């Protein structure tokens, strides 16, 4: 678990700023005569830096471009509608669910002990319960009195420009001075050009097919990444981290289940393939972008390079 997380604390967000946020918006979660406890940093999760402050779990999000506050707001509506398995964020005294520190989104949750321990593989019964609960989420309609701005699937690839820039920087040698993985990236991208081109061509074709078929269908409210990091398999099955919520075909969640657990409800193959391809290419774009910029070869870099090599494997016969 720790090997795949954000291992290093983000020093751009000062701890005193986080404590100030808690003091101003969440003081009522502590006894009035109690001094606020210090922050404890947890190296968990790839998309956030996480802290515990007594009964609170504080998530400083790093996904600035793909961040939609409405995704967290809709999880609060899900919880309030009786879906107790949705671990929703806590609204602050100012009424907001999403706060900002140093231009980073910050979301505060109740602290749950099981969210900080290494996950155990789920049983088939637990996976079946997860599927049933995701099905309930898919059918959810927010009340008209509380509209939320949740993005809708457009079958596009928002990372395409980043991927193009990273590939060109690697091939042109523009990133050679960025850090210890720049040269390795250039070699890997050069050998995998054909594989990457085929992957992108297939993704474009499948995206067009899915967009045409989905037109006119009722969208489902999807979580987007019901993985071991975001589902707590304890006595029940609780779903956390709703930052990627989106109106989309249900296969958006089923593809994630297939990728992580190797099983999913009966689904349309072309939609499953679209989400598989988009995930694959997004991972390549993210990690390639990291290694064409300044980096030091720290523990986070080591873990991300290992992941990149899984998504961009050496061609057969390469030496």
From Swiss-Prot:
Pathway: Antibiotic biosynthesis; streptomycin biosynthesis. InterPro entries: Aminoglycoside_PTrfase, Kinase-like_dom_sf. Keywords: Antibiotic biosynthesis, Streptomycin biosynthesis. Pfam families: APH (PF01636). GO terms for biological process: streptomycin biosynthetic process. This is Protein StrN. The gene is strN.
């Amino acid at each position: 678990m720790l090997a795949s997380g954000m291992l290093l604390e983000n020093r751009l967000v000062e701890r005193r700023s986080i404590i100030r946020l808690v003091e101003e918006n969440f003081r009522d979660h502590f006894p009035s005569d109690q001094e606020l406890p210090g922050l404890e940093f947890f190296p968990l999760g790839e998309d956030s830096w996480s802290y515990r402050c007594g009964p609170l779990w504080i998530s400083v999000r790093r996904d600035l471009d793909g961040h939609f506050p409405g995704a967290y707001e809709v999880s609060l509506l899900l919880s309030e509608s009786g879906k107790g398995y949705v671990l929703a964020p806590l609204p602050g005294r100012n009424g907001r669910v999403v706060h900002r520190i140093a231009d980073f989104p910050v979301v505060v949750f109740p602290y749950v002990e099981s969210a900080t321990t290494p996950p155990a593989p789920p049983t088939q019964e637990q996976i079946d319960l997860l599927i049933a609960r995701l099905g309930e989420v898919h059918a959810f309609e927010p009340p008209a009195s509380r509209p939320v701005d949740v993005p809708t699937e457009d079958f596009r690839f928002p990372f395409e420009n980043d991927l193009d820039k990273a590939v060109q920087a690697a091939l042109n040698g523009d990133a050679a001075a960025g850090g210890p993985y720049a040269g390795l990236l250039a070699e890997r991208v050069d050998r995998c050009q054909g594989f990457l081109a085929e992957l992108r061509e297939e993704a474009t074709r499948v995206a067009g097919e899915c967009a045409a078929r989905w037109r006119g269908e009722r969208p489902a409210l999807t979580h987007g990444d019901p993985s071991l990091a975001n589902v707590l398999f304890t006595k029940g099955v609780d779903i956390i981290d709703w930052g990627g919520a989106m109106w989309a075909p249900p296969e958006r969640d089923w593809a994630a289940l297939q990728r992580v657990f190797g099983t999913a409800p009966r689904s349309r193959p072309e939609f499953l393939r679209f989400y598989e391809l988009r995930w694959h290419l997004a991972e390549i774009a993210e990690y390639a972008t990291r290694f064409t910029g300044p980096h030091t070869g720290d523990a986070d870099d080591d873990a991300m390079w290992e992941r990149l090599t899984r998504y961009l494997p050496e061609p057969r016969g390469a030496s």
